[in-house]
Every structure is written in C-alpha cells, then in structure tokens.
C-alpha cells in the first residue's frame, strides 16, 4: 500500500463509530505512517450527520479532521469532478472526492470501491 491517499468519507464514519480496522488506519495517520488528505466535501458530509448536534461528537469530529490536510474545492478540481460526473454517472460528492485524488496524484482509499473503480483516471484501494 502506497503511503499517500485521499480518504473517503465512509472510512471516517467507520472510525467515529468505533470500527476497529478504521481506528487502526486513523492511528497510522496520527502516527504519520500514512499521509492522508480529505476533500472539503468530506468535511461537509461529516458535519451533516445527525449525531453531530452533540457537543462531544462535534469536538471528536473536529479533532479527527485536524489529522488531515483538507483540500479545498478549486477550479481544477471542480472541472475534473464535472468531467467525472458526466463520464461515469456518479454523484457530485463522489466526483469531487475522486477529482481531489486526481488533483493530488494519489490513490483514493474508500470502502465504496464499486462506485469509484470505474473512474479510469484514478487508483482506488480498499483499506480493510
């Protein structure tokens, strides 16, 4: 496994839910054995969860997000995500996350491999 990834939202959700393989992966990121980015879309998706209303959950989420370099949607990512959405018929958030991996020249780490693997321009890997 390469050591530089864009991390998909579902992996972070797994971590927040206490799923051990996801917690182990986040520990590797925290220990700087893996370099990981998230898209600003991932942050938005995480903060849209119903459990985020609780202050403790919001604090845990902010701490988790602080482990990553957040990649903000820019013109290049926006245009590439539009191309991915058009060419591969995927949802806009997924297209933006895929375009972020393309922009950073790294693999996309996701549990949702079936939706992303059709995008020929990026490498997709399942974490567990």
List where the protein language model places each region.
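Nucleotide phosphate-binding site architecture
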Residues: 12-13, 44-47, 117, 125
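Short, flexible helix/strand-to-coil boundary loops that buttress conserved ligand/catalytic motifs
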Residues: 16-17, 50, 85, 120, ...
């Amino acid at each position: 496994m390469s050591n530089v990834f864009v991390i998909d939202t579902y992996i972070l959700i797994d971590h927040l839910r206490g799923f051990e393989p996801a917690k182990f992966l986040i520990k590797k990121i925290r220990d700087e054995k893996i370099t990981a980015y998230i898209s600003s879309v991932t942050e938005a998706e995480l903060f849209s969860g119903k459990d985020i209303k609780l202050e403790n959950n919001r604090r845990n989420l902010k701490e988790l997000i602080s482990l990553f370099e957040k990649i903000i949607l820019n013109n290049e990512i926006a245009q590439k995500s539009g191309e991915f959405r058009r060419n591969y018929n995927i949802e806009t958030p997924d297209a933006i996350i895929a375009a972020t991996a393309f922009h950073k020249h790294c693999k996309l780490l996701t549990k949702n491999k079936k939706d992303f693997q059709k995008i020929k321009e990026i490498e997709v890997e399942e974490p567990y």
